[in-house]
Design a protein with these regions (language model features):
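Positively charged, low-complexity terminal tracts
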Residues: 1-138
Length: 138
């Protein structure tokens, strides 16, 4: 897909009744109702196939403000759904080193557990840093 191709139309806005219309390659204009959590305005740089239409919630980032580097984002999460694909369930999208992963409830709970475990480890390491900087345990 070429980045210099124009957007098909200005990002369609949601109508008062919660619907929006998307021009697709294979099904013409598709009129759909967006879930209340859908943040995407459904503007595409090229017409998508109907199965590529995506609902996404507003992304939420874990943010940290460090004295050394200032504010930084750590992980992005948000709801995602392809209402016309064979995977029409709602997923949690998580930005990782492996890319943007879509997981169900079990995967989401496991990621949350891993992040809590990592947060505990970071707290332990921060305590160790305090001791090292104070000259203890060197």
């Amino acid at each position: 897909m070429s980045g210099d191709r124009p957007t098909v139309a200005p990002e369609p806005r949601r109508n008062a009744d919660g619907t929006t219309s998307v021009l697709t390659l294979d099904a013409g204009i598709v009129r759909m109702t967006c879930p209340t959590w859908c943040f995407v305005e459904h503007g595409y740089s090229v017409p998508p196939a109907k199965a590529e239409i995506t609902h996404r919630s507003e992304p939420v980032w874990a943010l940290a403000d460090t004295p050394e580097h200032g504010p930084t984002s750590l992980v992005e999460v948000g709801l995602v759904q392809w209402p016309y694909s064979d995977r029409d369930a709602v997923f949690l999208g998580v930005e990782t080193d492996d890319g943007f992963l879509e997981v169900g409830p079990t995967g989401a709970h496991r990621i949350a557990t891993a992040l809590r475990d990592q947060a505990h480890h970071i707290d332990l390491m921060a305590g160790h840093l305090v001791n090292l900087r104070a000259g203890e345990g060197q």
